[in-house]
Amino acid sequence: MFRLWVKLFKDNHLLIDTTICDDTADTRTHKVMNSLEKACYEMDLSKPIWLDNTIKDFQIHDKCRFTADSFIEEVSFDYMEIQVLEEDY
């Protein structure tokens, strides 16, 4: 099972979080993108833009942050953090 933890922070305080599970046979990239899309829908947010720095952090650490600059719409938090909790190999 693949699980992605999505958290929103403001002033270093956790505002809201959710965990998205994916049992499909998709590739890891598809699972990440689909889970992020589901989390954004759940939290009523637009999907963030993946910058080169964000992609590199995610590839190395299985964790990354999307700042307000990563969103087209104005957001009411400082950053969104995503982290892979569990993966199928």
Segments predicted by a language model, with ranges:
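Generic structural motif
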Residues: 9-11, 23, 85-89
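Acidic, low-complexity intrinsically disordered segments
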Residues: 35-89
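Short, flexible N-terminal segments of the mature chain
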Residues: 16-42
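Short, extreme N-terminal segment that most often corresponds to the first beta-strand
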Residues: 1-21
